[in-house]
């Protein structure tokens, strides 16, 4: 019995360590991509995979006249539910991270923010220009936003493998750059990949957001008062023509960061509860009894309310986004049915797809690191920003190469940019190949440039 308990505990410990490892999210994403590609291309599973993605979803209510569509009369499929529904939570988490970085993190002051923000800007402009140089005037031109994004899960995951080789300042730089890059990608989606906007629905959504803002200002900290209007705002965005995922980012900006209780109140109240707990009568084998449980619940509630709602939600949602939502998104979108080797000829130009593969591949592999590096170099040389402490130009370029891992956000933009399924599929193949090449290049360069530093 003891041996079984010990093995069970060790299994739980290994599982917890895996979930907490910075590279685990990237590994799960990679597995999801591999499974999706296999299911989409194996003869026995290809049809079933496509049928699964195209299952219609509708929330319905039963009225006097029978069943009627309530929420999704536009014929929402399982795949679009993942893209328009589940990904809202992903963007909500990104919004919380951006807000945290702006308020208390690496983007909280001009001095801290200038280098990663300029690097992110360069890492978006140069890939877009490279893509546009291949596709200007073609049917593939709208895809210029695809190679401008960085997948933070993969980039940070790979960098964490070299924890003893890379200066901590460069890890902070890449994290801040990825957050700024996400903000840029969100703006690109909002400005260039929306549909015709229904101004009435948008106005109603804005009024509700103003109400959420005032809830924040008056100090309301009960999550239900934010959750219900947030769902309404998402629905209004969904029907308004603005991509519904952006509602997650907007709502995140109004979630309060300030805790309900001050440090002094928390310390005083917790001290009183601890004293009351110790004074409560208790036999040696009777802990916790009902009275103890009351005090423990009070202490737990006090500790929870002494952490801002924004931080609590970020901590709560992060594992679900990393290990559930993003893998589902990858599973639903990375499964490209390859019925011809033509799909792998990403440098081939066709009248139907333009040079979409060439633009994406070189935008990620060349444009991203070049843009990040040149913007950083100019910022440091003109004394607008300071070089990350302990970092050299070679290592900064190696880390910049990891910025070419687009994947999640790039695939998301790919699905928005094109209506033609063939162009979307070719774009996904190019994203996977460009991201893989960027990951390999960044890994090799980090290994080469940091090799001498490992000798102690």
Regions found by a protein language model. Give the residues of each.
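Functional cores that coordinate and move charged inorganic groups
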Residues: 159-271
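Interfacial/capping segments of alpha-helical transmembrane domains
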Residues: 33-63
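Predominantly late transmembrane helices and immediately cytosolic-facing juxtamembrane segments
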Residues: 2-21, 226-229, 244-389, 453-456
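Hydrophobic core segments of alpha-helical transmembrane domains in multi-pass membrane transport
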Residues: 28-41, 90-96, 126-128, 208-213, ...
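Structural signature of hydrophobic alpha-helical transmembrane segments
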Residues: 51, 80-91, 139-153, 194-207, ...
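Hydrophobic transmembrane alpha-helices of secondary-active transporters
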Residues: 69-71, 80-104, 320-343, 361, ...
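Entry/N-cap segments of selected transmembrane alpha helices
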Residues: 101-128, 198-207, 340-370, 397, ...
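C-terminal ends of transmembrane helices
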Residues: 12-16, 92-108, 156-167, 210-221, ...
